From Swiss-Prot:
GO terms for molecular function: ATP binding; D-alanine-D-alanine ligase activity; metal ion binding. Coiled coil: none annotated. Mg(2+) 2 binds at E315, N317. This is D-alanine--D-alanine ligase A. It is an enzyme of class 6 (ligase). The gene is ddlA. Mg(2+) 1 binds at D302, E315. Residues 143-348 form the ATP-grasp domain. Keywords: ATP-binding, Cell shape, Cell wall biogenesis/degradation, Cytoplasm, Ligase, Magnesium, Manganese, Metal-binding, Nucleotide-binding, Peptidoglycan synthesis. It comes from the Bacteria.
Amino acid sequence: MKEKTRVAILYGGRSAEHDVSRLSAANVLKAIDRTRYEVVPIAISRDGRWRLQPSSEAGADGAGAQVPEDGVEVALLPGGKGRLVALTKNGEQPDPVDVVFPVLHGPFGEDGSVQGYAEVADVAYVGCGILASAAAMDKDVAKRLLREAGLAVARSVTVLKGDVGSFQEIAGALGLPFFAKPARQGSSFGVSKVHDRDGFEQAVETALRYDSKALIEEFVDGREIECSVLERADGSLTVSPPGEIIPADKHGFYTYEAKYFDAEGAVVKVPADVPADVVARTSEMAARAFRALGCEAMARVDFFLRADGSLLVNEVNTLPGFTDISMYAKALAAAGIGYSKVIDVLIEHALARHRAR
């Protein structure tokens, strides 16, 4: 009888998206095929401690997969090919894992940090590599690379702590309203819509509370369209039909609350009601954006569709959400690839990439 592949599922983490990660992990833990995989849940506390969880007990409450304060602390052994070192009283050590599946969002999980740790540990891991993870996480860097690849993006100005620039200069360059957002955060954390000079200072201060660099970006009057990209072990890409996010008017834009905590915060429509030529262009542009950033395995590519039919790439998310309302799995389901199959493909990709190195 073939042994099951041991999959360490990482969730929680130090970032502001800790709770989002828990919601995503609950779905992955529910969807993964336990006849094929031995699941090794590892909950990461807000202070960054990794704690091994019994597979049968890492279920979900209303807030997602549990991150208890107890549990055996573990770490990946550098060069250990998946060996876990545990801090236990009796000295017993857990079995090695075959692949690490980071279900982590934001800094310390989506930005190349965990990917680099897995590389040092010489263990297979799901998702993009170090460079693509870091580049996509930094909205400023990602925009530069996408623009260099010939893809249209929204106009923006990058500001740093201590070097913000004046409202007059930025409004003159981008027009009003515009958005201020942390350069390296997700889930709309720290994002503000600026309508006038009075709101500018507070918006920048909020963005820089989450990062040392902020992006000031023009307001784009358009529909929010998203495509899921899934790469198989042979390098071939599947790009889903586009889906659409329709935020409720009361939120003004697709806020963190609208995404995760307001059942009526937005409508997720898959597939999007768009003309065939828009479907074709989003598919082609999503694949180009994926390759431009050097992505591997998976990404969600977000667009703005303007009234004249033009498309702008908004961002590339290398560890998209797996929550109940998240677009990534929903859009792939519309392409005929179910949740469990997506997980299979991602794990197969991770193992094949590691074998090839």
